[in-house]
Each structure stands twice: as C-alpha cells, then as structure tokens.
Amino acid sequence: CDSITIEAGGEAGLFYAFQTLMQLIFPSQKAEKGSVAIPCVKISDSPRYKWRGMHLDVSRHFFQKEFIFRMLDAMAMHKLNTFHWHLTDDQGWRIEIDRYPELAAVAAWRDETLIGHGSETPWVYDGTRYGGYYTKEDVREVVEYAARLHINVVPEIEMPGHAVAALQAYPELSCTGGPVPPFNRWGVSEDVFCAGKEETFEFLEGVLTEVAEMFPYEYIHIGGDECPKVRWEQCPLCQKRRADNNLKDEHELQSYFVKRMEAFLAAKGKKIIGWDEILDGGIAENAAVMSWRGHSGGIQAANMGHDVVMTPHLFVYLDYYQSEYNEPLSIGGMLPLEKVYSID
C-alpha cells in the first residue's frame, strides 16, 4: 500500500475516519520527522449508537473551561458525539443567567465542602468557600469548540429536585419560603422547587429561555431524579395544585411539573431528556429517558416508544472505585474495567 483512501457519508464520518487513521500511527512515531509507516488495512465501520456520550458534573466539583476543552478533545478521539454538561445541582449553580443575577452571585458558591463520605459521621468539612460559574461567553466558546469536533452539547438544568443552590439564591421558590442554606455535603435534600407556586414556573421558564438560546442542540436535560416529596406533601399550595389538576399523588404532581416544562421547551423547538424517574407518575409525551438506576427504566421507556440513553450506574459511572479501596476517594461502589465492558 502506498496511498490512503478515505470514504465517508458526510463530514462527521470523515472526521471519525481521521481519528481511526491517527490511531494507526504508533505513539513512538508521532514525534519523528518525515514519513511514518502504518499497517496496510481496510477498515469499514459505522457508529453502533446514535448517542455516544460523556457526562461531566460541574456542580459538585467545578472544572475550568480549559479542562472541558481537553475533555472534548479526548471525546473526539474516542468518537463520542454528545457532551452532557451537568450545570446545576444542590451543591452549585454553574451557568450565568442575565435575568437572575443571584444565581452567579450566590447560588454558584458554597461555604465549605464535606471531606469524605456522607455515611461517615461525624461530618468533617474543609472550611473553604468553593464555587465558580461559566459566563455566557464561556458557554459560547465550549459549544463552538465542541461543534468543530462534531460533538453536541446537552445542558442539564436540574428540576424539581437537586435545586438547593437555586433556592439558596431565590428561597421564595421553595415550599417553606426559606431561608435555604447552602448544601455543603453529598446526598439528597428535601428542599425542592415548589410545584404549587406559579413563580417557580416563571423562574424556570426564564432560565430555560436563556439556556435554549445558548445551546443549539435539540435536547435540554431537565434532571427529574431523586426528588423527595416531603415538602410537597406538607405544602398547601402543592396540595391545591394536586387537587385542582386531579392528580392522585405527588408522583403525578412531578409528572405535571415535567410536562409543563416539556410544553414550554417544545414551543421553542427543543426536546427534553430526563433521568428515569420521569417515568414515575406518567412520562411526558415526547421526552427521552436517561436510565441511570439500571436497565429496566430504559427498557420500559423504549417499549413505550421513547428514545432512551442507557447510563446504568453500576456499569458506567466513573466516580466509583476501580480496583482497591485504597484508591483516591470515590463516591463508593466497585466498578472494575471488565465490568464496564460487560454491559452488553
């Protein structure tokens, strides 16, 4: 062989073919000047999955945009095409929203951070203020950089649970009215967006309007996971919302919440995707499901005609221990590489 021929069905295919070509060059040759030798092969392949993603939680641990650029480079090398950017959670709000400046000034920061696991008591904290957020210019740069690598960016704005950071800045959107202190540890808080207040939906619609303008991809992730119903059960406004809409329980109230968000985003030409808890109480008509608690939720959603992304935590979460428990601190669990490969 004395030549290289690449055929592809489009620009993305050509890009992926180049990644394959680069992988055929031995690492020891890349630093050498002049010609290099590569194996004489014929490769014919295509993606197995439409959505080939990587998720980065920047709420609990903030990463500068330069890190994200390097991560996108690595994703492109592995022919991944979707960057799931987890921008909000209990521990921090990481995206600038012009209409709500307190999200950057207050919600992006916590007083300190838990050292170790939440199950290890008494809790010990580091005493260091922690936080940060991405400006709209930062977001634009990330989205444009990703696009050059044929990577779509899916922002995640958590609702109705995992909302403490937002409620820290705007406590009037909680069921109790606040104050809602910073969430400095891991786990799940009972403080969630109040489903009985119209102000909650006005706030989220304002946020999502700006988010939709920043992210051109068709999907926006709305979270939907791990939403305790304790506050809703005790909240007169949430119970009135339930009664007025003939909802039999708080799971259906969450479904009402998600469906309102879906309708709002659909009017802006966007689709929603959420964690598999959005199946509880009745799934929104056009929602896609990201199944993290195992395979069953994804299978259920697929059988109902919904698009599904499989993300079962026991197989694909990267914040688990990989071999011995004397590794650097992880959230828990044990996930050796061989188990990751066994997911099929």
Residue spans for each PLM region:
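Feature activates predominantly on carbohydrate-active enzymes
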Residues: 1-219, 235, 260, 264
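Conserved, charged catalytic cores of large soluble enzymes
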Residues: 232, 236-240
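A cross-domain feature marking catalytic cores of carbohydrate-active enzymes
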Residues: 56-58, 87-89, 155-159, 224-226, ...
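Flexible loop/turn segments at secondary-structure boundaries
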Residues: 62-64, 90-96, 160-166, 221, ...
